[in-house]
Design a protein with these regions (language model features):
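Sec-exported extracytoplasmic/periplasmic mature domains
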Residues: 86-94, 180-188, 192
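Short secondary-structure transition/capping segments
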Residues: 37-41, 128, 134-150, 184-201
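Surface-exposed short loop/turn segments
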Residues: 23-31, 95-147, 156-158
Length: 202
């Protein structure tokens, strides 16, 4: 009986050590290049205001299964939105305040959620990432307009010699590029934006 209990205790201790060893402390900074969108500029003057939470966005997670993750993407998020918005509208500028009113339309993006999955969790041979955005809109004189919500999705296959950090970073970069493509096509079609562009273009 004593040997049996000792064996169980040792097995539990070994399992705990293995689980602890599998936990990771990971810090990533997402870097990506957004291609120039092939779009026709809308005849609107637009300003974008980036809240600090967006400009410095950092995903953090600590769980027993995954360990501790810290993923920085704020700089890349700002560059991606600037890249797309500057090509979408005839006039574009960054604003220091969401109340600045020298433009016809003010865009205030927020990140609602970021998620990712790894091959060992899904059983597939690729990493996946999702970034959900809420784009708040208002006119230059402060009238709030219906917001637009969309999700960027990315995936990256596991490389034979690449670490999981590389695979995850690549899937997040892919999600940002996908978000840029959706922003380029979806925002101009969003009714409040489309209607104002049509009126201005008359």
């Amino acid at each position: 009986m004593m040997r049996s209990r000792l064996a169980v205790f040792l097995l539990a201790a070994v399992c705990a050590m293995v689980l602890t060893g599998c936990q990771k402390n990971v810090t990533l900074k997402v870097e990506t290049e957004i291609p120039k969108p092939l779009v026709t500029k809308l005849p609107l003057s637009v300003g974008v205001y980036y809240p600090d939470a967006f400009r410095r966005y950092e995903y953090t997670e600590t769980t027993e299964e995954r360990g501790t993750w810290r993923i920085e993407s704020g700089d890349s998020q700002v560059r991606a939105f600037n890249r797309i918005l500057s090509e979408l509208f005839s006039e574009f500028r960054e604003l220091n305040s969401p109340q600045a009113g020298a433009v016809e339309l003010i865009v205030v993006p927020e990140i609602a959620k970021m998620q990712f999955s790894m091959p060992k969790e899904t059983g597939f041979d690729y990493f996946e990432a999702w970034v959900e955005y809420v784009v708040k809109l208002q006119t230059g004189d402060g009238e709030e307009l219906p917001a637009w919500r969309f999700t960027g999705y990315g995936q990256a296959r596991t490389g034979r010699f690449a670490g999981f950090e590389t695979g995850l970073a690549d899937s997040l970069s892919d999600a940002l590029r996908n978000a840029g493509a959706q922003l380029a096509t979806g925002l101009p079609a969003h009714p409040p934006v489309r209607q104002r562009a049509q009126r201005t273009g008359l």
